[in-house]
């Protein structure tokens, strides 16, 4: 179906199982007339929507849909070169979908720009998602499982957290329970909470992203995840840089390498839990922290472990400049092995490497005295100045 240039005021359209709907980008305008929903598709075989401007006019959407464009079940979905504006809920709400969303501009959604749940081979690439109320791009599952969505080359900007909370909302890219997701080459700026937040996402890759001016932790891998590769990202401006945490919930197994983290703040969107905001990189279990550069982290450059939740962490070959404490490592009873070696630490105001009992520093500078009798620590060949 080809829509010539013009304005089309419509409501409550049920899309057929096979449809190619196309128009002239910016000139073929579908305007939501209200009183229910705009586009709803269920159990589609092949659905393509290309070259359309879709305007929700911030009108009310019924409880039977989650977004201005709602697709529940699609063997092959293509949304390409569209503009989707002013949704009263999510802009795109996708459930059990395979296919691709690409080269589209999405803005002004009351909730998230793109919400995907239970995907099976979805690619979200080359889009601009901006000025949304509660999230940018969401990749979720109802239960933990393989998802394999690719989120690449998108611009995500100015994402708010109108629903409040301490992390579920206000994230540029949010992965929840979805395994095997790749998040690469995105530019994410001015999000109320995280640029990229993965909660329970196994085998996630977060690579080559630019994360600017995040309100809370810029890159988060948290809760019951197993497997995270976080590399070659730039974080400039955040309350915390990169957090790979929640060993107490089963979070473990990660590589954090070749990231640049700078210009952190001790002010966040809510009163901080101990030890506070202003940490460059945090890791807890079965993790290698290697070859990163951290500058201007007012609390800690690196934070290794929390209480007894420390196991098999290496911190080697990192450069840390202008931190409160260069590296803070747990020395609580029950903490597991950590190797801290071959790091350069410059301008750490409260010591280059300090052992901590939770938030309290309890050792001298280990860069000068070695492991201070803590058998679980190896501290060697670090250069502090």
Residue ranges and their predicted role:
Residues 1-4, 9:
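Acidic Gly/Asp/Thr-rich repetitive segments characteristic of extracellular carbohydrate-active
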Residues 8-22, 30-76, 91-97, 142, ...:
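Extracellular beta-strand-rich solenoid/capping regions of secreted or surface-exposed proteins
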Residues 16-18, 25, 43-44, 49, ...:
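Parallel beta-helix/beta-solenoid
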Residues 10-12, 25-26, 31-38, 58-64, ...:
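Short glycine/acidic-rich loop motifs that flank beta-strands on beta-rich extracellular proteins
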């Amino acid at each position: 179906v080809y829509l010539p240039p013009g304005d089309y005021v419509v409501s409550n359209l049920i899309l057929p199982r096979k449809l190619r709907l196309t128009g002239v980008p910016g000139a073929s305008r579908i305007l939501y007339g209200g009183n229910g929903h705009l586009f709803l598709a269920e159990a589609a075989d092949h659905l393509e929507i290309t070259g359309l401007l879709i305007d929700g006019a911030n009108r009310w959407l019924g409880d039977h849909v989650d977004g201005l464009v709602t697709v529940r079940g699609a063997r092959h979905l293509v949304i390409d070169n569209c503009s989707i504006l002013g949704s009263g809920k999510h802009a795109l709400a996708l459930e059990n979908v395979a296919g691709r969303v690409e080269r589209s501009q999405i803005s002004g959604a009351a909730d998230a720009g793109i919400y995907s749940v239970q995907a099976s081979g979805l690619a979200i690439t080359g889009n601009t998602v901006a000025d949304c109320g509660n999230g940018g791009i969401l990749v979720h599952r109802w239960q933990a499982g393989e998802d394999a969505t690719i989120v690449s080359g998108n611009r995500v900007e100015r994402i708010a957290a109108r629903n409040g909370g301490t992390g579920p909302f206000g994230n540029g890219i949010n992965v929840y329970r979805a395994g095997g997701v790749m998040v690469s080459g995105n530019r994410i700026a001015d999000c109320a909470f995280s640029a990229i937040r993965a909660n329970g996402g196994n085998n996630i890759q977060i690579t080559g992203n630019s994360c600017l001016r995040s309100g809370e932790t810029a890159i988060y891998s948290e809760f019951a995840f197993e497997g995270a590769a976080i590399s070659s990202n730039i974080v400039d401006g955040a309350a915390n840089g990169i957090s790979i945490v929640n060993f107490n919930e089963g979070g473990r197994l990660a590589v954090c390498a070749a990231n640049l983290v700078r210009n952190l703040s001790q002010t966040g969107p809510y009163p901080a839990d101990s030890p506070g905001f202003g940490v460059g990189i945090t890791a807890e279990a079965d993790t290698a922290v290697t070859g990163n550069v951290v500058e201007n982290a007012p609390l800690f450059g690196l934070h290794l472990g929390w209480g007894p939740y420390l196991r098999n962490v290496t911190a080697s070959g990192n450069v840390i400049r202008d931190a409160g404490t260069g590296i803070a490592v747990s020395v609580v009873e029950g903490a597991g092995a950590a190797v801290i070696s071959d790091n350069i630490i410059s301008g750490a105001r409260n010591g280059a490497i300090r052992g901590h009992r939770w938030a309290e520093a309890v050792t001298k500078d280990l860069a000068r005295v070695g492991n201070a009798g803590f058998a679980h620590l190896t501290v060697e060949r670090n250069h502090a100045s």
